[in-house]
From Swiss-Prot:
It comes from Mycoplasmopsis pulmonis (strain UAB CTIP) (Mycoplasma pulmonis). Pfam families: Thioredoxin. This is Thioredoxin. It comes from the Bacteria. CDD domains: TRX_family (cd02947). Residues 2-109 form the Thioredoxin domain. Participates in various redox reactions through the reversible oxidation of its active center dithiol to a disulfide and catalyzes dithiol-disulfide exchange reactions. Disulfide bonds join C27-C30. Keywords: Disulfide bond, Electron transport, Redox-active center, Transport. Belongs to the thioredoxin family. InterPro entries: Thioredoxin-like_sf (IPR036249), Thioredoxin_domain (IPR013766).
Length: 109
């Protein structure tokens, strides 16, 4: 998973299928989700699906708990799946691996 500033991630997610995680190093749920997201990324890679995985630090982005932010990051971790610049899924906090994998696979059916 590539770590980016939001200003850079914003440009990269305009094309293709992208998984964006907003998290923070001090967040227990974020730490718990890290191996799950790594497993999701590996499974998607094994399926040869062209998906980019990005991590954005929620604190550094200046978007955490900001109601007027460009992207709603009201809880962390927040997971966005974006296709060609449009949000197709948002998940907050813990999500099981199989749900995230299925949400991504649906975009290629």
């Amino acid at each position: 998973m590539e770590t980016l500033l939001w200003k850079d991630a914003r440009e990269k997610i305009k094309k293709g299928v992208n998984f964006v995680e907003f998290a923070a190093p001090w967040c227990p749920d974020c730490v718990m989700m890290k191996p799950v997201i790594e497993q999701v990324e590996q499974e998607i890679k094994n399926l040869n699906l062209p998906v980019n995985f990005y991590h954005v630090n929620a604190d550094e982005s200046g978007m955490f708990r900001k109601a007027d932010a460009e992207v709603a990051v009201l809880r962390i971790p927040t997971h966005y799946i974006v296709k060609d610049g449009k949000q197709v899924f948002i998940g907050y906090e813990y999500f099981p691996k199989h749900i995230l994998v299925e949400k991504i696979k649906e975009l290629f059916k």
